[in-house]
């Protein structure tokens, strides 16, 4: 009985250790998308630059991204904020941490104490993602072009079902032994990806998203030509196990980073 109990406890310890190890390696990303008017932009940007991002860094979040649309949407002005979290616990606790930070509250006073008659923004949309194990951490792009000229391509692949979404993710991250995966092809051609991830909470699911980055529009076009003409992609896209309409909607959003963006 003692031996059996010892073995059971040992097995549980191994399982718990494995679970902790996996969780420790997984990064979660939040996109906060501000819907706001042009007149509201200065207040939100000052809050992000002077209060929010410094407070996040004090809380252990090393890099935060802030992006705008290259071609503004005149009907729905947006500002994108990208925050990587080391765990779901860190994500869950962040608002409490900020609320206890007096320096944050002073620096963000105009934004935080805005009246309903003079709002700081229209609304905030939130997307929560889990990093793929093939790229468990975000990467700061290794680009040398001016930030205002860069093209950050945010892609969203929606699937018609959870099963087909899993198939698309497998094509994206595993592929096959001979040709590799989509992610491998991106890496081969140096697409300077910030992240690859699965949406775990948002208005568009099931869904995978990723962000690749380029010095400018010509650089973007040249990289995609390499990808589309890659012989491994020619095979991978036609494999029967990855057929069957795994993507029902492919959205592309073209962004550029603001000067105070870490990404």
Protein language model annotation of sequence segments:
Residues 236-238:
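Short, membrane-exposed interhelical loops at transmembrane-helix boundaries
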Residues 1-26:
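Bacterial Sec-dependent N-terminal signal peptides
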Residues 23-106, 110-233, 243-263:
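Short S/T/G/P-rich N-terminal loop/turn motif that feeds into the first structured element of a domain
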């Amino acid at each position: 009985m003692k031996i059996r109990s010892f073995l059971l406890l040992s097995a549980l310890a191994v399982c718990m250790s494995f679970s902790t190890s996996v969780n420790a390696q997984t990064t979660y990303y939040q996109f906060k998308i501000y819907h706001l008017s042009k007149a509201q932009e200065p207040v939100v940007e000052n809050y992000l630059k002077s209060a929010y991002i410094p407070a996040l860094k004090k809380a252990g979040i090393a890099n935060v991204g802030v992006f705008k649309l290259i071609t503004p949407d005149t009907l729905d002005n947006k500002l994108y904020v990208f925050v990587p979290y080391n765990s779901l616990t860190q994500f869950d606790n962040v608002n409490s941490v900020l609320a206890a930070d007096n320096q944050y509250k002073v620096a963000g006073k105009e934004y935080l104490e805005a009246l309903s008659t003079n709002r700081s923004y229209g609304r905030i949309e939130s997307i929560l993602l889990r990093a793929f194990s093939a790229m468990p951490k975000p990467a700061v792009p290794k680009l040398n072009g001016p930030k205002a000229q860069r093209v950050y391509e945010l892609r969203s692949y929606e699937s018609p079902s959870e099963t087909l979404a899993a198939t698309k993710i497998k094509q994206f991250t595993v592929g096959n032994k001979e040709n590799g995966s989509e992610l491998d092809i991106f890496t081969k051609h140096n697409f300077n990806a910030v992240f690859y991830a699965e949406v775990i909470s948002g208005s568009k699911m099931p869904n995978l998203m990723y962000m690749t980055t380029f010095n400018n529009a010509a650089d973007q076009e040249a990289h995609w030509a390499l990808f589309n003409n890659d012989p491994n992609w020619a095979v991978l896209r036609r494999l029967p196990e990855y057929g069957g309409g795994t993507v029902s909607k492919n959205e592309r959003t073209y962004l550029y980073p603001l000067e105070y963006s870490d990404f």
